[in-house]
Amino acid sequence: YATAVDYNKDAPTTRLFYKKVQNKMHYAVHGHTAAELIVERANAEKEHMGLTTWENAPDGKIVKPDVSIAKNYLKQVELEDMGKLVNSVLDLAERMANRHIPMTMEDWAKRIDIILEAGGDAVLHDAGKVSAEFAKSFAESEFEKYRVIQDKLFSSDFDKFNSLPFDDIKLSLIHISEPTRRS
């Protein structure tokens, strides 16, 4: 979309355009907007709070920013489908640019709908039923409940070290303090 003649990375209309495109892609893949997906899948009682990935996955803690990213809730098959859909749009953008065909962001919105329709995907024509603000608030509320559970289950390297029998700790410390030998 950066090739659109009316593209301005700092313009509010550009940010709104990206949100619309993101929601169209999500809707085509799983039938929900990004916000709807978060509200549907964020659940403090589920394993990993319903997330399938997060910044420190798979062994690190989930942190608050992780829970309001819709992509983090996608199943593997959905993630792969999303990737294919994004690639098809990028391939079209490259072809249009190579042929020097001027496009506006509105032109891109129409082309994306055409791509979705051609693939037999549902096309989102509105903003969905859940706002991004509500989804973020909901996910963060679920996270606060989940954090209590996670903190009980999670053991840090320090906790693991402290749970070692004393002889193992002594051996670990000896190993750490040994100078490295060079040949």
Label every PLM stretch briefly.
Residues 1-173, 177, 181:
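Positively charged, phosphate-engaging catalytic surfaces used for nucleic-acid and nucleotide handling
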